Amino acid sequence: MEALPRRGSDFCCDPFPLLPAHSGDSGYAVKMRDGTIRLLSNAHVLESGQITTWEHYLDNKGLLILQPGGLDLTNAIATVDTWITMAEGGVSIADAALAKPFNPGDVDTSILGLSVPSSVIDPVPGLIVKKSGRNTGVTTGIVEAINVTTRMTYQQYSSFSSFSTLFNNCFTVTPGNFGSGGDSGSVVMAGSSAVGLLFAGTDQLSFGTPM
């Protein structure tokens, strides 16, 4: 199965995920082993140009994270802390990154319109799920398939070139309007349990990676 984030019905944050001024979602606040708080989202939302194995055009550790988003009127709330580097032409673990908030006490751990995640569960076919996203708000869907392998193509503004990478162990959610551009990084929830992180989609389904 192949899903390309191109202009129109498909989405992967914005049609060209590496523009260093994105809009997407901070999935939710996670507590690290040392007790500090980080904001979890997609690498293509938070981290911009560093997600490939190419020579990077921007050193994004410390890159400002803006709220409500780089395409909106904004204020800086966090900086990029760490990310999973994507494997050009290979297999990538996930499209994910963490940001360090300036004022952890200001972070609301709840998800707008949903509950506070209290556990993590695996996706299973037939599971009813919800997500709260920047573009489409709170939507309900059903996990259609698990253990899905999908090839994603990311385009890079700085060079007007692209690279592809495979993601294994993904799951899909239907219907197609479960997510849309700007919803990348949303946490897929089942009740009060986090199921995965939304990172891409087409006009027929959305793709997530398990937590």
Give the location of each predicted region:
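Hydrophobic alpha-helical bundle architecture
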Residues: 173-193
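Serine endopeptidase catalytic core focused on the charge-relay Asp
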Residues: 2-169, 189-191, 195, 199, ...
